[in-house]
Amino acid sequence: MDADGSQTLEAQVDALMDGLRADLERLASIPSVAFPGYPPEPVEEAHDLLVSLLREAGVPTIERIDLPDTAPVIYGEIPPPHPDAPTVLLYGHYDVQPAGNPTLWLSPPFEPTPVPGVPGALRARGIADDKSNVIAHLGMLRVYGGRPPVGIKLVIEGQEEYGSPFDDYPPTDPERFACDAMVIADLGNLRPGTPTLTTGLRGACEVMVEVRTLKEARHSGEFGGAAPDALLVLLRALATLHDEHGDVAVPGLRRDPWEGTTYTEEEFRLLASVRDGLPLIGTGSLGERLWSGPAVTVIGLDAPDVAGAASAVVPYARAKLNLRFHPLQDAKEARTALVKHLRAQRPFGIPLTVTPGDTGPGFEARTGGPAYRAALTALKEAWGTEASYVATGGSIPLVNGLARAAPGAEVLLFGAQDSMCNLHAPNERVLLSEVRNTVVAMAAFVREYAADFRAPQAPRTPQAAPSPGGAQ
């Protein structure tokens, strides 16, 4: 306890953890997948549960934002306790990725299950991404009994994973999203136990490539050797995307050195589950390959499956590509570079049909202001060690929309996930210790930010954070 007999912040959070765990398990048991072809009822169920939990936590104003072609967004407000207090916007999402092949899971994906041999770990789809962070927001509110020392605006999205027109909505209603700082909690730490602030997000886009060569399949014995094989044409085109070292070979995609914190090669090999004896691809530092340079991944392929393959020349093949690009490169510019490269390919003289898909811009955060100072103090208090600065290869499309709506706000990116959570993969898991520390960090952050925001500001030298361009 403190000198005045009150509980310490950590003791308060520890007393809340049983209830927060129970609520996390309830939320993670709901298959709130907001992809086409999935039932909408679980998404509504997750929405309603969160609204109920937020009301119980003391949020007086909760609205449902309904836009065409997207799941409902939860918007909540707690007014500032006094006119001089800052306002903090908290972001998360309650939808999840599809579970994929259930046979690859060690337990049912929507039955939260302790992970044997990993103390305090729970396994379920969405339990880390992003329901852990939504529960961390809830925990912070419970610490303060719904009356934190700052104003609060909550934005909890329902269709982040599939993509949503809500990404472009905040700039159309800037008053609603006005704030002094925002905490984007859709990520987490470089490794368990290492508090991490993310300062850059790579952008993302998708491109479809199709090849049609025959009206229908033909016997490979009679026609193979002269009839053009659509799958072979496609594979030759895809092979031009990288050079012999594995570096992306598409002209016009930005790549800069990275000089900030990153993984060791041993950590990365373990995290990426690279088989023993195989090399990593690409050149340069891991930070450069993962964060400040491009990556092109073939994420889907339409072609005959091996088990049912006939001895026939393939008439049609299609691939879906995912491009991740430098945080500061324009999204349309990056997508155009990839499309232009593919359209220039003519394997065996055969053209490709290239269809541009959706884009999500990258983002680089400003550092050094009062919110960042408060976050550094809070993260150290929660984890007991100084925070690291990193970037991430993932993207959070709404960040740019929120930043345009509140251009003066400091944007902080931290949360309860860690690099071993198996995000978007089978056997996703979260560590309750990271959830607990994130609640402590969020509660300490609003306390420190409220004090620093209203205190006279003496000149300070901001702590520099590495940018995606490598500057210190």
Language model feature labels by segment:
Residues A128, K215-A217, L323-D330:
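A generic structural motif
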